Amino acid sequence: MAVKKPENMTFEATIEELDSLVDQLENGDLALDDALRKFERGIALARAGQTKLSDAEQRVSILLSEDDEAPLNDFKPDSE
């Protein structure tokens, strides 16, 4: 299986893989080279996850700040 670049993964997949890597590293049964490789992958995943989270927070902030003064209207489906 090809390893996906962290920036091409969903936030959830990034966190899931990062959690798995942390478990493996905490277990302590890895050879030094394997542990270092997994640590490097974990750092890349953590950075990508932080970027995705920051982007999402920024989008939410923009959406909440857009047109605060707009009146609220009842929802009317197109089928009416």
From Swiss-Prot:
GO BP annotation list: DNA catabolic process
Organism domain of life: Bacteria
Reactions catalysed, as given in the entry: Exonucleolytic cleavage in either 5'- to 3'- or 3'- to 5'-direction to yield nucleoside 5'-phosphates
Gene Ontology CC terms, in alphabetical order: cytosol; exodeoxyribonuclease VII complex
Localization per Swiss-Prot or TrEMBL: Cytoplasm
E.C. number: 3.1.11.6
InterPro entries per the UniProt record, alphabetical: Exonuc_VII_S, Exonuc_VII_ssu_sf
Top enzyme category: hydrolase
Pfam families per the UniProt record, alphabetical: Exonuc_VII_S
Sorted UniProt keywords: Cytoplasm, Exonuclease, Hydrolase, Nuclease
UniProt GO molecular function: exodeoxyribonuclease VII activity
Main location: cytoplasm
Family label: Belongs to the XseB family.
Quaternary structure note: Heterooligomer composed of large and small subunits.
HAMAP family reported in the protein's UniProt record: Exonuc_7_S (MF_00337)
NCBIfam families: PRK00977.1-1, PRK00977.1-4, xseB
Role: Bidirectionally degrades single-stranded DNA into large acid-insoluble oligonucleotides, which are then degraded further into small acid-soluble oligonucleotides.
Name of protein: Exodeoxyribonuclease 7 small subunit
Species of origin: Vibrio parahaemolyticus serotype O3:K6 (strain RIMD 2210633)
